């Protein structure tokens, strides 16, 4: 626990959204937030409608993905039953149906699909609040193909990653590669180099303030 700070908050993907939310909460409590880093926490190129039609289209895409990836014929999707469930209930329902079809899919893969789906849904439905501090977006070139298949709106990236309307002091640092590569070499080295410089500056400012 840092007390009043200074705080350095960084996260990749959904972790970036959590870092951003923590920064807002800490600043509201009067804490000193010095650095907020979003590692390829890039919003869809346009808003994802939260409608019945969009829910059905999303699960149609998921069924195609399962057929292609696991070589399994997904049973007809019971849309009416799904629409009465939340996101966690929906993905559990579908994955249970796939398991019950008799296809042998390792439990780890099933759990990965569940958590990945829920993470993406959290990103799509998050209510972003404005932030008046400095934010650094480490931005890859694109999302990976599976993410775009699930949600085609991720194929388009705004130059500001969709953050400009919420953050006045936004710095975009291009790192190259795809979303899932952002925390691997050589891309993470670009993040590390930029962050090291920023942290060194924060440390120097702290020493200067302590000497006064």
Describe the role of every protein-language-model region.
Residues 1-212:
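A hydrolase-biased, glycine/serine/histidine/acidic-enriched motif that marks catalytic-domain neighborhoods
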């Amino acid at each position: 626990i840092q007390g009043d700070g200074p705080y350095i908050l960084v996260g990749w993907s959904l972790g970036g959204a959590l870092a951003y939310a923590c920064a807002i909460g800490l600043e509201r409590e009067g804490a000193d937030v010095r650095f907020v880093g979003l590692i390829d926490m890039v919003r869809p190129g346009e808003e994802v409608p939260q409608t019945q039609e969009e829910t059905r289209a999303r699960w149609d895409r998921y069924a195609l993905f399962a057929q292609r990836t696991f070589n399994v014929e997904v049973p007809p999707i019971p849309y009416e039953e799904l629409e009465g469930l939340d996101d966690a209930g929906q993905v559990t329902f579908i994955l249970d149906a796939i398991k019950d079809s008799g296809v042998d899919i390792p439990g780890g893969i099933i759990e990965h699909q569940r958590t990945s789906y829920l993470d993406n849904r959290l990103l799509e439905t998050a209510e972003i609040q404005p932030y008046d501090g400095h934010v650094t977006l480490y931005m890859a070139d694109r999302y990976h193909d599976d993410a775009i298949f699930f949600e085609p709106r991720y194929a388009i990236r705004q130059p500001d990653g969709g953050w400009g309307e919420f953050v006045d002091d936004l710095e975009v640092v291009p790192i190259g590669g795809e979303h899932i590569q952002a925390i691997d070499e050589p891309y993470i080295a670009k993040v590390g180099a930029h962050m090291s410089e920023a942290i060194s500056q924060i440390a120097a400012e702290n020493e200067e303030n302590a000497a006064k």
